Every structure is written in C-alpha cells, then in structure tokens.
Regions:
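General small-molecule cofactor/ligand-binding pocket signal
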Residues: 136, 194-198, 380, 409, ...
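Non-catalytic terminal extensions of PLP-dependent enzymes
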Residues: 1-25, 37-77, 86-102, 108-111, ...
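Flexible, glycine/proline-enriched loop segments at strand-loop-helix junctions
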Residues: 107-115, 136-139, 168-175, 215, ...
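Short loop-beta-helix segment that forms the pyridoxal 5′-phosphate
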Residues: 108-112, 129-148, 548-571
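Conserved phosphate/anionic-ligand binding catalytic regions in large, soluble enzymes, centered on
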Residues: 272-285, 289-290, 334-338, 424, ...
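Cysteine-centered functional microenvironments
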Residues: 106-107, 526-529, 559-561, 614, ...
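Conserved PLP-enzyme active-site core in the AAT-like
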Residues: 10, 145-310, 372, 385, ...
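TRNA-binding/sensing appendages of the translation machinery
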Residues: 28-42, 260-265, 691-694
Length: 941
C-alpha cells in the first residue's frame, strides 16, 4: 500500500488488516479466491488490460493542463446554439465545483433532497416565466434531443381521429439548426414519421400533419411572427413546437403568447460554459393539459406529514422506471446540475440582469448591422435578436477573422453568420466591423450612438419576467452564497455519507478528476470550431475512445450519447442500421429479460422495436430455455437481445455465453447494458463474452458524478462489423462511414466531462482498474455476509456469492412489523444515510451497492444502522405511532411539542456516532399523492 498512488486514494479499503478482516467475514482466504467464486472461469480474461501504468495525481495534473493548453479557443461568434456567456464565479465556485452539489443523486428521496429540488424549481419557474407556458420539466439533455422529444410528444397527443386517419407528417421549417434537424431525422424514422421540411411562410397544411416545428429566432437569426402560421396549424388539428432561445425571450414576445403548444431549447447561455458541446440543460415547457405526456422529471410542490410545504418529483408514473415501454420517453439522467446553475444565474441576475444581457447582445448586433450596411453588405435577415446572416465571400472573411483570433459560422461559400452574446464589448464590435471593412478595402465608419432595435413592434415583449421573490432577494454575492449554502445543507450527498444505491454506482468523484473541468482551455471551446483549434480535445477524445474500446474488448467507440438512456438508444439504432444494410430491416424483435431496468424497454420502444419479454427463474437468472424458445420462434425477425451483466439481480450468470450464442444463432445481435460494468473492468468484458455493442455509464463505472440527476455520458462501444454505423453529425466529421444520424446536438456529446473519465483511466492504469473492480466485489460480499444474520440476500450466484451489489430481503417486514421498505428508507435519513434502491428489481427489497470507494468504517456504520432499524421494527410491531413509520424527524419537530411513545433521543440520535455530524432532514415524510393531485411546478410566493 502506498498513498502516493491514485488507486490507494480512490479505493476505500487499502489497509491489509481491514481487508483480511473483511475476507474472514466472507469466509475466503484471498481476493483471488473470492473473485474465482464470483465470476465464471469461462469468461475470465486471460491477460491484463493493455493499458499503461497509472500516473500520479501530480503527473496527471501537469498532463491534463498541457492538453487544455493545446486547445486554442478563439473569440467565438459562431452561435448555432452555443454562446460565450458570463458564468458567475459565485455559482461556479459554490455549485459547479462543490461536491455537495455534484455528488448527490437524483432526488427520488425527496425528504433529503429539498435543496436541489428548490434549485430545480427555480429553473422551472424561470423557464415558465420566459416562455409564457404553464408547466415545465427540470431539464432535458440538449436542444436537439428536446426538440425530438417534443416531436414524439405531439405524436402521442394525436386525437383518436388523427390516429385513425394515419396522420404521420411533421412540418419542420427549414430555418432550423442543422443539428436539431438531424436529431428529428434520427428519432422520427423508427416511428414512421415523415418530415416535411419547407418554408413556414408559404406552407399550406394538408390535414395530414400532426405537428409543426419552428425556431424562434430562426437559425439565420431572423425574428419572425408565427401567429398566423400557428392559427393555421391549429385549424388543421396540428400542434406547434417553438425551439426558442431563452435569452432572446427577455426581449421577445413569449411563444406561449403567440400560441405555441410546446416550447423547447437549450439554457446553455444562461450561465453555463460551452464546453465543446456540453453538458447543458435542455428545457421543455408546455400547456398543463399535456402534463401526462411530457417527458423528463417535473418538480412539484406538496406537503409533508406535519403539513409543511415540501418539494418532490411529481407525476413519476409517466417515467421509464415505472411505465417501461409505455413511458413518455426513455430519458432517465438529464442535466440537473446545469439546470441548477441556470436557476442560480437567474436568481443572481434577476429580471434586470437578464434584460441587460439580452440588450447587450441585441445592441451589438444592431450596431454591427448598421455599420455593415454602410459598407455595402447585404443582410438576409432584417429583423434579428443577436444573429446576422450576411452575403459575403466566406473564404475571404474567414481568413481575415482567423488572423484576428475570431470564429464565425459559414453556412455556404457566399454567406457568413455571426452571433453576439452578453459578453460582447464595443471594442469587439469595432473589430468585427473593421474586419469586414478590410475585406472590401474600406475604412469603417464610427457611429456616435447605438443603432435602433430591429425587433418588430408586434414581437417586443411587454409581459414581465422573473417576478417571483426568489429572483429579487439574492442579488449580492453574500446573499447568493448564503442562499446556495442553505439549500446545500438540506441535501445528502457523498460529502455527507455513503450512498449505497444499487445499480447506480455512487463511487468517489475525486477532486483530481474534477479540477480540469474549470480550465479555460476546456470550458471555452465551441463545438463547431475548426478541429485544428481543439488539438487537446481531439487527442483526449481519441485516447479515451481507444481506452474504452480496450476495456470493453470491442473495436470502436462513440462518445456522442450524453446519457445512459441515450447510449442504449444509440446502440439499438446502430444494430438496426446494421440489419438494414444487409437488407434485413424487417428484423425488429428485441428480447428483454423481465428483470431489466425500465430504460431498456423504453429505449427499445423508441427505436421502433417489438419487445418480447424473457422470463427469469426463481434465482433471478435469465430462463435460458425460455430465451432459446423465443429466439427460435422469432428467428426470422429477431433484431437482438438486451442483457445487463452482471444481472440486475447482482449476480454473474454462468450461462451467459450460451445465451449470447443462442441469439447469434438466430441471426440477432447482442446489446449489453453497461450499467453494471463496475463489476467487469479488468476481469472480463462484453467483447470477450460475445456482445456486439454495449453502452457505458461514465457517471457510474468511470467516476463522473451524478450531479443530482445529471449530466451523464453514455458512450457506446461496438464490434468491428458495427463500426461503420456509429453516430455521425451534420457539422463535424465523426462516426462511421455509414453512420446513423446524430443522437446528440454536439459531435462529441458532453465533451467537457470527458477529462474526468480520461483521468480516471490514466491515473488508475490497468492494474488499478482491476483492483477497483475486485474491491467493489469484495465490499458487496462483505456487506452481504456481515448482514446475513439480520437480512437475507435475496439472490446469489451458484457459489452463494454476489457480484458488486446485493438485494436485501424485506418482504416479511410488512407482515411481521407493519413496516415496509419505504419506511426503512425514511428511517435511514434519521441516521444520516441515503437509502439503497427501493423495490427494484424485486418488490419490498433494498438493493445495496457499496462501490470500491467506501472505507470499511463507513460500511460498518451503515450496517449498524440497518441492524438497529430492524430492532426498532421489532419493538414497534403493532404500534401505529412508532419511530420508523414517523421518520424522518426534523429539528423543528424534535424541538417542538412531543407526544410520541418514543423519546426525542431515540428519534434523532438512535446511535452514539450520529451526534458527531448529525444530518437533519429539512422536511418530514412527504405526501406524494398530494403533489400529483395538486400539481404546482413553479415558485409560489
């Protein structure tokens, strides 16, 4: 053991004496003996991973800085959905760089998530204020995927008559960002949706359309009045989605006011860096009548057991973890951390600050337009917010711009497009004008006053924005800092205690991995900048793709998918494209085990596949006979199998190769869900097992944080025969020669996050990666063995061992004690712990995944809490008013009148060590039903 290595900092148990004690509890003599009992010998790798030895933290810090310095972010006026902006230092320091914010999990356990729930409610409120809509979700992945989600939402909202009539056409205005159009192409094809791409102002509805998509302002910057178009669409029973720039809505009439049914877009320019494409918070807002068809998470307002206001995730019955293939979307992880930052940006700036930012961009555009007109240039758009589309010789302008360290966008050889932003200065405007003047051999004219606004009078905003108290109360940095801290203290994160959520892999997000995200060379790159300006990024991306391919045993990798669910979808679409290339597009049946996570069937449904469920046996394994029967039955139409390995039940199934062979023999491909890859790395891999494609959750196995509900990255790795079909992009060269259309707005997805996983691999090296996997398995088996006398492990492998997680059986608690696993989860909050995964994949169980990062002392505390809670359950049997069912207990309740049969100390300090760092839940048990029945998804005074 040497604490000079990253591995010994990352892995929680490095002390040999502690490790021996754990192995003794398990009943094995060595780690190797345990691994041999856990992983079938037939799939064990025969040689170590072909990766370099791990760097030290110091070496990596120097290395990653050098890579960042090889990026050369020029002053970007490219626009196209990505803009330089002022990221408030107070938000960057207190949120983006703060582990209390970035290490928390999605707020399913709302009582210990009130801080980030309020931050997300602020985001929703800001979106509603700007768009003029009635209900908003708390983020999507990016603008392109948000638009695609809106398309499918409009498709789902078709009336019965429209469905009977076979309305499958979607009008798309051609003045749309190309990456957004590409996403629409990707998502529409599996549903048989026909895109009609045309000009909105000359289009006549035929009655075959179910919806329409327009951009506001348009891709070329034009501000257009869509009111008559919307009226015509509605007259033909078609709904309209507006893809709207949020900053522009500080000055422009809200889409909700001119009739749009859905409003989507990106919130990037409200306080989050470009980051070479992400992560950013996509958004969606709509009419309340459509709330049950809306994708993504919605934060609502409810009450707790004591009648206090409490926040929660509302209307969860729409989502994939419950509705599976009938869900509104496959989206799971979104962009919660970025949405929180946007919310704080709006809190900090308020209405005045937002208008000032918008006016800065608009004034710069107006001043430049006037100056260019004086030089004889022709603008294709006369009414604009921040973007000018200019007739000019692109090659000449580009050469002069690069000399000055400036990037524009060049839609064609005869046009130049430039977008201004909130950080544009008068000197920069003068520089741009001088550049265009030089191109014509002229001298620029200096104006003494600002040009008048070009916004049409009918489209100028008259309604107020950000009127809620929260957007007026925290305008100084001291006030904002304290507000952020108040919210922070209401949440449990990895900064407080272990989060043992099964199937979520809440491991350490090391500071050495997070620091590079704040480097200017990574933050300030535009995703559509020439790649020669992004040498550091391109080297990092190429190396990371190689490393992930090596780790998975596959041939190639795409980093474009920006969530695990997006990776699932991308992998299935690649398989689909492969079958189509062989003239077998009719292969559309996908086999999915009954135990699969809900995203699997939801993603398959979005990929246009017919789902056939495979049974599981009494031990939780795939019923191989049932799988073979169904593979043979559907052999002529079999697309493939989606399988999680180790299984969702936490065990390595010994017949996995037999399963893979059966699918291949029937003509199908094998998609492996990488959710549990933390139990494979360095010991086995999907390629060695026989899978054709797998997705990875970099925010699980590879040390990216969860961010309270995202962002994440979900790359796919594929075998050689699938390499040609990796996702492409309409602006940057990426993907295979026959690549599917884009699955994310940016060519390399959420590229700003990639240094995390890159560093994780570089600092652990092949040996460290293997050790991390081994210790994840050791920790899970230690806890399973140590708890065996009190909690039975529901499933185990043939040798009685589990993989990297285990399912604790609480199925008798309701009968024996009148207490269910939800009550146990709430009681754990009083002990300062986030509960494990509840009732998945088996009802009334807890799925525990300790990961390799937890120290033995922390695991022991968690187990002591579980055992003590069981004693409390035994003592409370038959009593309605008991310490477990009333949990969690707030400080206010403890300090108030007390009539319970148990003491205040028993409620708040049931074990001695809790007093050392007591976490106080901010609210008591929340009434979920009330929040759904009385949906409020914005701040209330």
């Amino acid at each position: 053991m040497s604490f000079d290595t990253f591995a010994d900092r990352h892995i929680g148990v490095s002390n040999p004496d502690e490790l021996k004690a754990m192995l003794d509890t398990i009943g094995v003599g060595s780690v190797d003996e345990l691994i041999a009992q856990v992983i079938p010998q037939s799939i064990r790798l025969k040689k170590p991973l072909d990766l370099p030895a791990g760097m030290s933290e110091y070496e990596f810090a120097a290395h990653i800085r050098a890579l960042a310095d090889r990026n050369h972010p020029l002053r970007s006026f490219i626009g196209m959905g990505y803009y330089p902006c002022a990221v408030p230092a107070a938000v960057a320091r207190n949120v983006f760089e703060n582990p209390a914010w970035y290490t928390s999990y999605t707020p399913y356990q709302a009582e210990i998530s009130q801080g980030r729930l309020e931050a997300l409610l602020n985001f929703q409120t800001a979106v509603l204020s700007l768009t003029g809509m009635e209900i908003a979700n708390c983020s999507l992945l990016d603008e392109g995927t948000a638009t695609a989600e809106a398309m499918l939402m409009m498709f789902a909202l078709r009336s019965r008559d429209a469905v009977k009539e076979g309305r499958t056409q979607l009008f798309v205005d051609r003045n749309l960002f190309p990456q957004t159009l590409d996403l629409l192409l990707t998502r529409s094809e599996p549903f048989g949706i026909e895109l009609i791409v045309d000009d909105y102002d000359c289009y006549e509805f035929s009655g075959k359309e179910f919806g329409a998509v327009v951009q506001y302002p348009a891709a070329d910057g034009a501000v257009r009045d869509y009111a008559a178009f919307v009226e015509a669409a509605h007259a033909h029973d078609a709904k309209v989605t507006a893809v709207a720039d949020l900053l522009s809505l500080a000055l422009l009439k809200a889409p909700g006011e001119w009739g749009a049914d859905i409003c989507v877009g990106s919130a990037q320019r409200l306080g989050t860096p470009m980051g070479f494409g992400g992560p950013h918070a996509g958004y969606m807002a709509t009419r309340e009548a459509y709330k049950r068809q809306m994708p993504g998470r919605i934060i609502g307002v409810s009450v707790d057991r004591l009648g206090n206001r409490a926040l929660l995730m509302a209307l969860q019955m729409r989502e994939q973890h419950i509705k599976r293939e009938r869900a509104t979307s496959n989206i799971c992880t979104a962009s919660a951390l970025m949405a929180s930052m946007v919310g704080f940006y709006c809190v900090y700036n308020g209405a005045e600050g937002l208008r000032r930012a918008a006016e800065t961009a608009h004034t710069a555009a107006c001043d430049t337009a006037r100056a260019l007109a004086a030089l004889g240039y022709k603008l294709t758009n006369q009414h604009f917010f921040d973007t000018l589309d200019i007739e000019a010789e692109a090659a000449v302008i580009q050469s002069l711009a690069l000399e000055r360290g400036i990037n524009f966008f060049y839609p064609s050889e005869e046009r130049v497009r430039l977008s201004f932003d909130e950080v544009t200065t008068p000197d920069e405007v003068a520089e741009v004008v001088a550049l265009f003047a030089e191109a014509r051999g002229r001298k620029p004219k200096v104006a003494r006053s600002h040009a008048p606004s070009t916004l049409p009078e009918a489209l100028r905003r008259t309604s107020p924005i950000l009127i809620e108290e929260v957007f007026r109360s925290h305008r100084s940095e001291s006030a904002l800092m304290r507000y952020i801290k108040r919210l922070e203290y209401r949440d449990i994160s990895l900064a407080d205690s272990m989060i043992s959520l099964g199937s979520c892999t809440m491991k350490l997000n090391a500071a050495a991995l997070m620091q590079p995200l704040s480097l200017a060379g990574f933050q300030n790159m535009h995703p559509f900048a020439p790649v020669e300006q992004a040498e550091g990024y391109m080297e990092l991306i190429a190396a990371l793709e190689r490393d992930l391919a090596t780790i998975t045993g596959l041939a190639a990798c795409s980093l474009q998918p920006n969530s695990g669910a997006a990776g699932e979808y991308a992998g299935l679409m690649v398989i689909r494209a492969y079958h189509q290339s062989k003239g077998q597009g009719y292969r559309n049946v996908i086999l999915i085990p009954a135990s699969a996570h809900g995203t699997n069937p939801a993603s398959a449904a979005m990929a246009g596949m017919k789902i056939v469920t495979v049974a599981c046996d009494a031990k939780g394994n795939i019923d191989v006979d049932d799988l073979k029967t169904k593979a043979e039955e559907h052999a002529s139409e079999l697309c493939g199998l989606m399988v999680t390995y180790p299984s969702t039940h936490g065990v390595f199934e010994s017949r996995i190769r037999e399963i893979v062979d059966a699918v291949h023999d029937a003509g199908g491909q094998v998609y492996m869900d990488g959710a549990n890859m933390n139990a494979q790395v360095g010991l086995t891999n999907p390629g060695y097992i026989g899978a054709d494609v797998c997705h990875l959750n970099l925010h699980k196995t590879f040390a990216m944080p969860h961010g309270g509900g995202g962002p994440g990255v979900g790359p796919i790795c594929v075998a050689a025969h699938l390499r040609p079909f990796l996702p492409s992009h309409p602006i940057a060269a990426t993907g295979g020669d026959e690549g599917i259309t884009a699955v994310a707005s940016a060519p390399w997805g959420s590229a700003l996050l990639l240094p995390i996983t890159y560093g994780y691999i570089k600092m652990l090296g092949g040996d460290g990666l293997r050790r991390a996997t081994e210790m994840a398995i050791v920790n899970a088996n230690y806890m399973s063995s140590a708890l065996a006398a009190e909690y039975r492990t529901y499933y185990s492998g043939e040798t009685g061992r589990v993989g990297h997680e285990m399912i604790l059986d609480l199925t008798n608690f309701k009968h024996d004690y009148g207490i269910d696993c939800g009550d146990i989860a709430h009681r754990l909050m009083d002990y300062g712990f986030h509960a494990p995964t509840l009732s998945f994949p088996v009802h009334e169980t807890l799925m525990v995944e300790p990961t390799e990062s937890e120290p033995k002392a922390e695991m022991d505390r968690f187990m002591e809490a579980l055992v003590h809670i069981k004693r409390e359950c035994e003592a409370a049997a038959g009593q309605e008013d008991n310490v477990v069912r009333n949990a969690p207990h707030t400080a206010v309740e403890i300090a108030g009148e007390w009539s319970h049969p148990y003491s205040r100390r028993e409620a708040a300090f049931p074990l001695g060590w809790i007093a050392e760092a007591k976490f106080w839940p901010y609210v008591s048990k929340i009434d979920n039903g009330y929040g759904d029945r009385n949906l409020v998804c914005r701040c209330t005074e």
